[in-house]
Design a protein with these regions (language model features):
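Metal-dependent polysaccharide deacetylase catalytic core of the NodB/CE4 family, i.e.
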Residues: 1-103
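C-terminal domain-boundary segment and adjacent tail
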Residues: 102-129
């Protein structure tokens, strides 16, 4: 945060919105926000019920993405992940990388390479208001 990054809510337990009752999902979001105090929200897996969206949009700015790097795939290498960034990034892209156990090894290589390439292409990084 001191370096200009923002923190957003992504639920406390990374639960899927269609697998849980709306009240359970909203409670899980609230649990996370009790700790991180964010005004941004991104739903795990990019899905949520209309009722959940309606409720959450009153308290949070909902942020989606347009490029998932697939860094979690066991079939992709770090180079493949960087190539996904190069192939699919466009002006205004919101790019998703993961820091999970499935992706962490690739993240250490792919993220710095992708950031370098993006800067070389003239892309700028901005936070949400």
């Amino acid at each position: 945060i001191a370096e200009g990054h923002q923190v957003g809510n992504h639920t406390f337990n990374h639960i899927g919105a269609f697998k849980h009752w709306a009240v359970t999902y909203i409670f899980n979001v609230t649990q996370a926000n009790d700790i991180i105090h964010a005004h941004l929200f991104r739903p795990p897996h990019g899905w949520m019920r209309h009722s959940v969206y309606w409720w959450l949009s009153k308290k949070y700015r909902i942020i989606m993405w347009d490029l998932v790097t697939r860094d979690y795939s066991k079939w992709l290498t770090a180079k493949d992940v960087v190539n996904n960034v190069k192939r699919y990034t466009r002006n205004g892209s919101i790019i998703t990388f993961h820091d999970s156990l499935k992706s962490i090894d690739k993240l250490h290589t792919a993220l710095p390479e992708a950031l370098t390439w993006l800067k070389e292409q003239g892309y700028e990084f901005k936070t949400f208001e």
